[in-house]
């Protein structure tokens, strides 16, 4: 841990989601106090399950909550891809002992609320993190000694620096960058189904995906296998805006009429759906603006096709902490090192996720090519292809 900073001012964090609370933990571990400004009336995560690769566990260990989170996770035996049209096996990636030896950490699935709770408990246990809810960041001003944040109630908050971790619709990014989100036209429906209602022949201990033309389905166990997360994605026929709302069973069924009955039955199970119209942004080279820096979805929102959104936010948090350890109380150099260490990697994730969406949703001849390319591929070949993503650690996170 770095020496305790001389100033009694906190670092301000806009956003109390996974990235914001992870950043709070990382900063406290470097001797800072933190004030989190969250717009929602209470902290929490919208959504259901989330997949965690080895890089996520490396980040959690660096934040000091690895064991706490491991106790809440479900460890899969494999990742499995089937063709949703004919049920054929496209590819299988074992995530057992050989996978763990290769990447020094497991592959797991966990409820978003459980990972957020682990982070929040870790932050609260430090006694150095203050959380203000119902606080909407409106404007940021800077001077040579720090930042002043103005919220929608007219209250000002003073800090050494500001971390903008306020999501896809980031107010901090809007002030400093001013770009628009790129609405993908892809819609995601998410639901949780109790084990007793889930088809027995699909109760696999795996992160399973069924890929189809302009659509795919994902399912995996949660919370000790007592629940199953069901996620379906399709290309919308309508003009979409980035949004989250209640889903329509009739709508989601209408997009999966051509897939095989075995996969389609999954869509008929949930009683309640949450609907996301997804968006990302074009990668940018500048995340740092004086004493303000972007993090997580505010910096690099990504589509879900690599299951890396939350993982990247936690990597950001750890890297930010490490940069401040190297350049203690030197904001210019610390923030520059943080930015230099993260921009290319996260841009690769954003662009790779777009391409993976195309592969998942291939149709016609492209579908045949996809299936042929992955057919019979050995675990080692898959692992080699994943090394750039899953090989990240707190020890190798800095660019120099």
Q: Which ranges hold each PLM region?
A:
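Residues at the starts of beta-strands that form the adenosine-phosphate
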Residues: 10, 33, 227
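Active-site substrate-recognition segment that forms the wall
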Residues: 205-240, 249, 253-257, 278
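A short coil-to-beta-strand element that immediately follows conserved catalytic motifs
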Residues: 183-186, 202-206, 227, 261-277
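Short helix-loop capping/hinge motifs at secondary-structure junctions, enriched
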Residues: 67, 195-202, 239, 262, ...
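Conserved mid-domain beta->alpha element of the FAD-binding
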Residues: 13-41, 163-164, 189, 219, ...
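Conserved N-terminal helical subregion
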Residues: 2-11, 28, 53-175, 179-194, ...
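Acidic/histidine metal-binding catalytic segments
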Residues: 71-74, 130, 257-272, 331-336
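C-terminal auxiliary extensions adjacent to catalytic cores
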Residues: 375-400
């Amino acid at each position: 841990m770095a020496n305790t900073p001389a100033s009694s001012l906190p670092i301000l964090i806009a956003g109390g989601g996974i990235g914001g609370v992870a950043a709070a933990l990382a900063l406290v571990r470097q001797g800072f106090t933190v004030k989190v400004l969250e717009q929602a009336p209470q902290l929490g995560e919208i959504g259901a399950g989330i997949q965690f690769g080895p890089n996520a566990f490396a980040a959690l260990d660096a934040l000091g909550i690895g064991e706490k989170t491991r106790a809440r996770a479900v460890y899969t035996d494999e990742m499995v891809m089937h063709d949703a049209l004919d049920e054929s096996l496209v590819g299988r990636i074992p995530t057992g002992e050989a996978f763990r030896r290769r990447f020094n950490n497991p592959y797991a699935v966990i409820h978003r609320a459980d990972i957020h709770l682990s982070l929040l408990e870790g932050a609260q246990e430090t006694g150095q993190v203050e959380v203000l809810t119902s606080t909407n960041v409106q404007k940021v001003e800077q001077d040579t000694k720090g930042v002043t944040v103005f919220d929608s109630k007219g209250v000002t908050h003073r800090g050494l620096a500001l971390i903008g971790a306020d999501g896809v619709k980031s107010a901090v990014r809007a002030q400093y960058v001013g770009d628009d989100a790129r609405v993908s036209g892809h819609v995601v429906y998410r639901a949780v189904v109790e084990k007793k209602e889930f088809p027995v022949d699909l109760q696999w201990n795996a992160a399973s995906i069924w890929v189809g033309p302009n659509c795919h389905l994902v399912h995996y166990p949660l919370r000790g296998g007592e629940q199953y997360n069901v996620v379906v994605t399709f290309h919308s026929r309508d003009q979409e805006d980035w949004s989250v709302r209640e889903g329509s069973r009739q709508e989601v069924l209408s997009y999966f009429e051509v897939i095989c009955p075995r996969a389609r039955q999954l869509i008929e199970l949930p009683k309640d759906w949450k609907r996301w119209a997804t968006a990302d942004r074009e990668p940018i080279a500048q995340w740092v603006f004086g004493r303000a820096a972007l993090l997580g979805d505010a910096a690099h929102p990504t589509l879900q096709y690599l299951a890396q959104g939350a993982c990247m936010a936690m990597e950001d948090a750890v890297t930010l902490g490490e940069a401040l350890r190297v350049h203690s109380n030197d904001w210019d150099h610390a923030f520059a090192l943080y930015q230099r260490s993260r921009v290319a990697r996260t841009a690769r994730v954003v662009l790779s996720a777009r391409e993976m969406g195309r592969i998942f949703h291939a149709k016609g001849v492209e579908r045949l090519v996809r299936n042929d390319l992955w057919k019979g591929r050995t675990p080692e070949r898959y692992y080699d292809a994943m090394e750039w993503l899953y090989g990240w650690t707190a020890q190798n996170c800095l660019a120099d």
